[in-house]
Amino acid sequence: VKTTISTFLNDLAKEWCATRPIVSFAYENRIEQDMPVAFDSALKQMICNVLDNALEASPQWVSLEATREADALTLVVTDTGPGFAPAMLAQIGKPYQSSKGRPGSGLGLFFVVNVARKLGGTVTARNREQGGALVQLTLPLAAISLEEETPHGD
């Protein structure tokens, strides 16, 4: 889908919030320089998976913050849930790693990590000092940009 970073994220945040039973969703789009991009359903699903995991751990409050730093889009999802167990943090991105104990669990973050890697991005997870979890997605703008590259002459 051809759009801009801000339009895509604003629409995604609005749709996600409207279709989930969340008490408080703090969304902050701090992208100062918007740009045309192409987002596909895998990118949307990737972001929604992280938000859904946060919601399951923290139904009262989830936060999504978007920033553009140099040549990367950074999305940070935080919650006030119990955080990650140390064993889970060591296994982030591996299939079937879940704290939910249900068949089929544990593919959400595996999917997230694989989509990010295919785009040359990264996913990091940690526990917040004040409690809860933080997951950061960093995607290179070159992987999603619609802007033409200008050839460099030698």
Language-model features and meaning:
Residues 79:
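Acidic ATP/Mg2+-coordinating residue in the GHKL
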Residues 22-38:
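Conserved catalytic submotifs in the C-terminal HATPase_c
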Residues 1-21, 47-48:
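Short beta-to-alpha transition helix within the HATPase_c
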Residues 61-71:
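Short beta-strand/loop element within the Bergerat-fold HATPase_c
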Residues 84-96, 152-153:
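Short conserved segment of the HATPase_c
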Residues 108, 112:
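Short alpha-helical Gxxx[C/S/T] motif in the catalytic ATP-binding
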